[in-house]
Amino acid sequence: TPGNDSAAAYLARRYASFGLKATSPGFIQKFVARPPAHSGQSISLPSQNVVAMLPGRDPALRNEYVVIGAHFDHLGTSTEGALDPDARGAVRLGADDNASGSAAVVELARIFSHSPARRSIIFANFSGEEEGLLGSAYFVDHMPVATDSVVAMLNFDMVGRMKNDRVIVYGVATATEFPSVLERANAATQLKIAGQGDGFGPSDQSSFYAKNIPVLHFFTDLHDDYHRASDTPDKI
């Protein structure tokens, strides 16, 4: 859609402004989305992921990669998947689902661009998540690096509505190092982390875990505005 194209172009401009490396022309990884057919007739839609890379600072580790990702699509004016289907014509902005996660990835890219990590980082914004993880499914089959060089994937989906300093983190059992990594990372902020072991779930980290890549999915829980036109920026 024009909105999807505009969002992708914005993300690409931000990554370019940080001086990140493009892994495909203009940071855009094009693919053809084939959402599940509900009427018995399959459709094909051109779409895109937005992908950028930041080389690591440690020569011994820069050939290992961490993917930091989030989906940037939402429902828009479609009532398919909406929990307020009677609100026809309403624009479902998806401020929490998932502009919040997209913003988190962009902000992490900005921070790391000034202070690179030891390992290389791939920043990836996926389209087609709401239609069945289509963008991330394509990405894991067409990564700019070898699959076995990706040591972890961090997914941010719906991270803008935290209550009582509580964050749910899925996938903590997918790597033995994750519990201690989270503990160290949380030392300063002292958030209440509700860890869940399983790496599978209804978001893009599942595409990576299916490839045996350790994953973490950060999530601040569901709310009454989920998949409704009331998921607006003023509530973030």
Residue positions per predicted region:
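A non-catalytic alpha/beta surface segment that caps or lines the substrate-entry region
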Residues: 1-55
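Short, solvent-exposed loop/turn and secondary-structure capping segments
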Residues: 2-4, 62-65, 77-83, 133-137, ...
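Extracytoplasmic/secreted proteins, especially bacterial periplasmic and envelope-associated proteins
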Residues: 2-17, 26, 100-107, 111, ...
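Sec-exported extracytoplasmic/periplasmic mature domains
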Residues: 12-23, 36, 55, 107-117, ...
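Solvent-exposed loop/turn segments at secondary-structure junctions
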Residues: 15, 21-22, 35-38, 57-59, ...
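Alpha-helical metal-binding/catalytic segments enriched in His/Glu/Asp
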Residues: 52, 61, 68-74, 78-133
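His/Asp/Glu-rich mid-to-C-terminal helical/loop segments that flank catalytic regions of hydrolases
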Residues: 110, 114, 224-236
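Metal-dependent peptidase/peptidase-like ectodomains
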Residues: 126-223, 234-235
